[in-house]
UniProtKB/Swiss-Prot annotation:
One Gene Ontology cellular component: cytosol
UniProt binding sites for Ca(2+) 3: 91, 93, 95, 102
Family: Belongs to the calmodulin family.
Keyword Calcium: yes
CDD domains: EFh (cd00051)
Keyword Repeat: yes
Induction: By touch.
Disulfide feature: none
Official protein name in the record: Calmodulin-like protein 10
Amino acids binding Ca(2+) 2: 57, 59, 61, 63, 68
Pfam families: EF-hand_7
InterPro entries: CALM/Myosin/TropC-like (IPR050230), EF-hand-dom_pair (IPR011992), EF_Hand_1_Ca_BS (IPR018247), EF_hand_dom (IPR002048)
Gene3D superfamilies named in the record: EF-hand
Species the sequence originates in: Arabidopsis thaliana
Length: 191
């Protein structure tokens, strides 16, 4: 189901779009998308980059325009493959955990406006085992809880990852670009 965006959200999405649209021509190419991913330490192959672009390229021109970007932002379901990609995006040092410092780094690169305190709140909300960082299971549980309409600020422990993923598959999950995941994570925790 597509979301109806507020003017503020559209403005924020336009700013996010400009992070990727380096030359300002109104289209995100695989090269531009790849440059942002590499700046975050994620070295996707050309085929993976093209697949990410194709997931949102509604008119088939090989790029993502702002309207297509908004459509991608409106998607609210994800696949396990996308969960893993997004987890890798945040896990800068590739140690299997997302720290507050890594989340702040991604925030800086993608020009998000969350404060350090809000980042700490995200970590605390997702950190089920209390070790001060987010492992993959905690990340997936947080995203699946958000996906199923739970209040992710307080409900991150309900169910198992396997059950949550099975529920998602049963709903015919539609693959969404990783920027969609990350943006929705921040919006879900602070809306």
């Amino acid at each position: 189901m597509a979301n109806k965006f507020t003017r503020q959200q559209i403005s924020e999405f336009r700013e996010q779009f400009s992070v990727y649209d380096k030359n300002g021509d109104g289209h995100i190419t695989t090269e531009e998308f790849g440059a942002v991913m590499r700046s975050l330490g994620l070295n996707l192959t050309q085929a993976e980059l093209q697949e990410e672009i194709n997931d949102s390229d509604l008119d088939g021109d090989g790029t993502i325009n702002f309207t297509e970007f908004l459509c991608a932002m409106a998607k609210d379901t994800y696949s396990e493959k996308d969960l893993k990609k997004d987890f890798r995006l945040f896990d800068i040092d590739k140690n299997g955990f997302i720290s507050a410092a890594e989340m702040r780094y991604v925030r800086t690169i993608l020009r998000w406006k969350q404060t350090d305190e809000e980042i700490d709140e995200i970590i605390k909300a997702a950190d089920v085992d209390g070790d001060g960082q987010i492992n993959y299971r905690e990340f997936a549980r947080l995203m699946m809880a958000k996906n199923q309409g739970h209040d992710t600020k307080y409900d991150t422990t309900g169910g198992t990852l396997e059950r949550d993923l099975a529920a998602g598959v049963a709903k015919n999950i539609i693959a969404a670009p990783m920027t969609d995941f990350i943006k929705n994570l921040f919006e879900a925790l602070f809306s």
